[in-house]
Every structure is written in C-alpha cells, then in structure tokens.
Amino acid sequence: MARFFQPKKHSTLDTKHQPVTIERLDHQGSGLAFLHKKPLFVDGALPGEEVLIQLTENKSKYARGQLIKVLKPSAERVAPFCAHYAQCGGCDLQHLDRAGQIHHKQQALSQLMVKFAGQSLALSAPVCSDDQGYRRRARLSLMWDKKTQQLQLGFRRKQSKAIVNVTHCPVLEPSLNALLPDLNALLSEWSQPERLGHVELVKGDNTRVLVLRHLGALIEQDQQRLTDFASQNQLTLYLMLEAGELQHVQGEAPYCEETGSRLSFLPSHFIQVNRAVNQHMVVQALNWLEVSPQERVLDLFCGLGNFTLPLAKQAQAVVGVEGVDEMVQHATHNAKLNQINNVAFYQANLEQDMTSASWAQQKFAKVLLDPARAGAEGIVDQLSALGAKRVVYVSCNPATLARDSQSLLSQGFRLEKLGMLDMFPHTSHLESMALFVKKG
C-alpha cells in the first residue's frame, strides 16, 4: 500500500496573557495552577495569588507559564533581598517569607512520605540557621565573552547556561563575598581568559580556599598575579588543571571544626555547605540514635567522618563505610588527628551485598546513613541482616528517602521521627532526617 507524506501537526502556543489562581507550590517551589483542567507551573508565584501569565510550554499533560504580573499578592510575598534574584539560578524562593519557606518544605516532605511510603507523622522541629551569609562554599562559573571582550564571573541563569555576573551574593559567607570584586578584576586582566574554567571558594575555620580551574598550564605572568592575590588575601590556593588534577600552590591545609572534632579536607571533598545546620544535624542524629558506651555503630556513606567521629565519642566502636577510597584515607587521617582510636574506615560499593564483608561480621544495633541524592538502594535492604534495631537516615533527596523507607518498613521497622533540615534557605532544596525503630 502506498504511503503518502503527511506533514507533522504543529500546535500553536497561545501567548496571550491569561489570569490564573495559584493553588499550591510543587516540590520544586513553582506555583501550581490549573488552566483548562491542565496543571500549569509558574515560577515565582505563590499559593492563593491571582497572577497574569504567558504560556511558554504546552504539553499534553502539563503546561508552563511565565509570570507577567501579580494581580493579587499573597500575604507571604516579600521583596527579594538580592539584586540578582530575578536572573540568577541559585535561589528560587526569596519571594516567599522565611516562615512560608519552612512551611512549604515541611509540607512537601510530609506529602512525599505519605504518597510513596504510606507514612503520616507529625514532624519534629525544623533545623534552621541564619538565612543569609550561610554558604561556606560556592562554585562560580567563568566565561570569556568574545563579542564584548569581557569576562563573566557568577552563577548560571535560571534554566540557562548563560552566566549572571555577580559582585555580591548575600547568601555567601561574608569573608568569601568580600573577595568577589577583586577576584573579578584580577581574572578580567588574564592573558588567556578563554582558558578559564571556574572558580571555587571555600571557607575553612583556619583559612579561605581559592580553587581555579584552568585549561592547560598558566603562563608565568598570570601565575604570579594569582599567587600575589592569594598572598595579599591570605588564601590557600589550588589549581585544577587537566583531568581534574588538584595542585596545591600555597597556604595551609584547610580544616573545619564540627561538633568537637577537627575535619581536615581538600577542596575536592564533600563538606556540608551550611555549617550551623550541619552542627545541629549531627547533634540531633546522635540524640535520635541514643548510642550507649557498650554499642557498636555503623556509619554508612561516612565521607570524611562528619558523623563517625562524634559517634565514636559515645560508642564502644564505630565502623565508617564510604565508596570513595580517597575519602576513606582522609577520614582515617581525621580520626588520628583527633586521637580517636575506636573507629575504623572501609571502602565499599554499598549497592552490593555487604553481609559477607569483614566489617559486617560483628552486628550493629545502631546504624546511620547519609547517602547522596541517589539514596541507599542496595545497602538499605541489608540493614536487618546487619543487626540494626535503630536507624537514622539523613537524606538530601526526599524522593529516594521515601523509596528507601518502603524497604525499611518491609523489614519490620516503623517510622518513629521525621524532621526537615533547612540546609539551603531561599531554595526549594529539601534535606531531612528520619528515625526508624525495629518493632518488638
């Protein structure tokens, strides 16, 4: 049978301005309305608001719209305190007051746990911090604009690869913020600006760290300018050249003091961005676990020992397990640095069966997990076999927490406590802590 060419149907987007009423926020912080019974997502809109929107995307099951005007504002709406907020992709909830942000995140956490884990529970008090000056590390993008012959230093625009030039970031730790104007001036005079990659700034307790990603070796003139800048500002300087190799140039090795333990780290290592929330989080985790001096504790996804070392001060022995070998070595160094002798660290792929591993032969009544966004799939199924009676799960992704909760519930655990950790104020990013206790 002959086939005749049929042109694809092109649906035209109705771009006229349309009024809608926002019903609630979705889990990413966008306003949710309904247009012709179809879900419509509007960034920057708040529940209860009547707004004017223009469609930007219209799919079969949902649509997206640009906020044109707020016709009837919410009582929770506030003026953003950052001059870059309208363009920058870093924060997405500065238009919502602080109490509203916390309420939204708690509600989102509760809804996800009910939907995917079937668990409804009154939340513990949220763990919060100051909402400005809290970020002790940040990565800033660099791009040389050939047309304007100017360097762009800042953060990515919302839903774009373009860069918003930033000379002041209110959520950045003040001593890091102070570096931005002079750092921009320094790099704007770079001999080969097209080779600039990105900049990382980290605030340790003993030093500020500057990491420059550069494509290829630096010419002598640029190297001298950079080291002079680091010396004048008393910075620890690292270069990241080909293949992600980290090269220490000058300055003392950084460390941070966390709940009575000193954690040495490299800029390539993970440390929590919000120091205040991290410290409260560690204290809460230890309180929820209720560790006694006769118990062995297992810390999974242990990193540099953020939880492991404080746990070791309460337990008979602690085992920390981490997937990255370099982190294991550094965690071992941190234990020695703090003169803690009842802890051992191991490298392992925690997606695999660990029940036959040497460290798993002696059981653990108390277990703490702090996985990455992918969650603890694999090891979470083995917690009963490892002897766990009480489990604290620290999560940076409520969706994978809800998924992994199903495994724990099927093993005979019950959800005892649940709380929100506001690690990133003014963003929709949600972290949480859950306590599971074995029935009987």
UniProtKB/Swiss-Prot annotation:
Pfam families: TRAM (PF01938), tRNA_U5-meth_tr (PF05958)
GO biological process, one term: rRNA base methylation
Residue positions of the active site: C396
GO molecular function terms attached to this record: 4 iron, 4 sulfur cluster binding; iron ion binding; RNA binding; rRNA (uridine-C5-)-methyltransferase activity
Binding site for [4Fe-4S] cluster: C82, C88, C91, C169
Record domain TRAM: where: 11-69
Domain of life: Bacteria
InterPro entries: 23S_rRNA_MeTrfase_RlmD (IPR001566), MeTrfase_TrmA_AS (IPR030390), MeTrfase_TrmA_CS (IPR030391), NA-bd_OB-fold (IPR012340), SAM-dependent_MTases_sf (IPR029063), TRAM_dom (IPR002792), U5_MeTrfase_fam (IPR010280)
EC number(s) given by UniProt: 2.1.1.190
Keywords: 4Fe-4S, Iron, Iron-sulfur, Metal-binding, Methyltransferase, rRNA processing, S-adenosyl-L-methionine, Transferase
Binding site for S-adenosyl-L-methionine: Q272, F301, N306, E322, N349, D370
Reactions accelerated catalytically: uridine(1939) in 23S rRNA + S-adenosyl-L-methionine = 5-methyluridine(1939) in 23S rRNA + S-adenosyl-L-homocysteine + H(+)
Function comment: Catalyzes the formation of 5-methyl-uridine at position 1939 (m5U1939) in 23S rRNA.
Family: Belongs to the class I-like SAM-binding methyltransferase superfamily. RNA M5U methyltransferase family. RlmD subfamily.
Protein name: 23S rRNA (uracil(1939)-C(5))-methyltransferase RlmD
Record organism: Vibrio cholerae serotype O1 (strain ATCC 39315 / El Tor Inaba N16961)
